[in-house]
Amino acid sequence: MCLVLKMAFAAATFSILSWANPVRAADGPKPLFASDDVLSLTLTAPFDTISRDIAAKPVPGVLKVGGAAPETMPVTLSVRGITRRKKEVCAFPPLRVEFSQKPGPSSIFKGQKRLKLVTHCQRSADYQQYLLLEYTAYRLYRALTPESFNVRLAKIDYTYKDGQALITRLGFFIEDVNDVVKRNGQERLRGVRRISASQLDAAAAARYAVFEYMISNLDWAMTAGPAGADCCHNARLMGAKGVTGASTGLIPVPYDFDYAGLVNAPYAVPPDGIHVANVKVRRYRGFCAHNEEAKAFLTQISTRRDSLMAILNETPQLEDRTRRKAAGYLGDFFEEAGSPSKVADLMKVCLR
């Protein structure tokens, strides 16, 4: 599909699905996230010395962009994340890439300062499939609303400082949260540990909860952060200019989908206190106060089955077996979303 048609398709998808608060108009993304083409990169750094200590200093590295517009940029790298930074979970942890110099006006990284990079975790080919399914989850939510994180897939040659090759694997960059907020004409809520459900934008919260149910992700919270941390767990909150901890109409923006049943990573387990057998068992966790908005969104999303399935089918390098399983898993959700009786049953288990 040519770029023009892709852009037209994306615009049509937003106009149909971004039904919540249509007055919120989003700006376009920066160059890195203006295309879905797979980047070709080389990342050079002392990977054997990168510390997983949360207090460790970043290490210097070099990022090279291949293709028709090659460029070389100094960067600093640091380990990030919680579960995936643990050595027993990931041999290769997720990284934060910070640009040591401002990328030039013609750079694909123009306007970027620091980015999260989701890496392959383990050498096994299966882990590339888990990564691609998480990447797909981000793109599915992006198709539902511009109030979401953009992602960009890359084939990355990792090399040591002496030029010795380490490994070549797919990874993906996640849009900086401040760019998400700015792109949507909002302001980020900071320094707040907990909010009430009544402070959330009802349509945005319902959309969030239904989407997490669709991919069977339980590793999130819209109103509180982890112990000792700011709100929210695997979500960021944004609101109108001048937003405070007492504001209403807050929009939750989800991220980190590796614990989703759609991905089914081997290290993913249900959170404490949620009693399901495994992460593939769906559990609806939307608020009862948002049931009407959730039902409206379920009706809306059930009509978009084909366009959302097309996003899964477009994901590069997914194995046929992986694609079929994911399609079947999402298909179960769409069958439920299209059944009034099943939707009614779903609303009965909402959070009060």
Predicted regions located by residue number:
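Phosphate/dinucleotide-binding and metal-coordinating scaffold of catalytic cores
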Residues: 25-352
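Sec/Tat signal peptide C-region and signal peptidase I cleavage site
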Residues: 19-25
